[in-house]
Amino acid sequence: MARAAVRAGAKVALIDRDGACAEKAAAEIGAAAWGVGADVTDEAAIAAAMAGAERALGPLTGLVNNAGIAGFGSVHTTEVETWGRIMAVNVTGTFLASKAALSGMLERRRGAIVNFGSVAGLVGIPSMAAYCAAKGAVVSLTRQMAAEYSGQGIRVNVVCPGTVASTDMGRQLLGQDADPELEARRLAKYPIGRFGTPEDIAEAAIFLLSTKAAFVTGCVFAVDGGMTAI
């Protein structure tokens, strides 16, 4: 995602709970990137990280909220602690990062926010109660933000990826041991005949951040190989 943004001409701030990881990734990208550690569920930490990014790179014009965690469990089996953790990272994290970014965007009357949902926020997936609920909340929050802020120069959209097999999330969904039968069953749900790639998802987000999407706001952008079409 960050590399795609830099290729498009942007400067990027990478914020991760693991500060060393964020700094290492930024160093690998080069001078156009800056990395810092912050927990998206900590309001003070994420606000400080945003302020640091603006000092390092200049005014914030785009935000990608792609911090997220998944988990497995039905309503009757999910522990309250698991439910709370999934909601905190996926929903509260999106809220807090957006809140931190919006003050400057509103002052400048310019900005684009891309939230990350999931096909799990659009359709029901067995044994993923908390994750489906969290990503559904992100979709609804995106629509609310678009309705409220688009007239003030700030567009808000949500990308809802299908399975991306090469990511940690994709490996969770397919099983750590890449069960061929499970993979085949999941693949059968994708009319395009393959799972997504990180590049597929990144290019969708970069489009929504760009001026090419100047008339796009409140959009639920399913990047899912047709999964939700059937």
UniProtKB/Swiss-Prot annotation:
Top-level taxonomic group: Bacteria
GO terms of molecular function: oxidoreductase activity, acting on the CH-OH group of donors, NAD or NADP as acceptor
Any Pfam family: adh_short_C2
InterPro entries: NAD(P)-bd_dom_sf (IPR036291), Sc_DH/Rdtase_CS (IPR020904), SDR_fam (IPR002347)
Keyword Iron on entry: no
Keyword terms: Plasmid
UniProt-listed GO biological process terms: fatty acid elongation
Family note: Belongs to the short-chain dehydrogenases/reductases (SDR) family.
Name of protein: Inactive 2-(S)-hydroxypropyl-CoM dehydrogenase 2
Source taxonomy: Bacteria, Pseudomonadati, Pseudomonadota, Alphaproteobacteria, Hyphomicrobiales
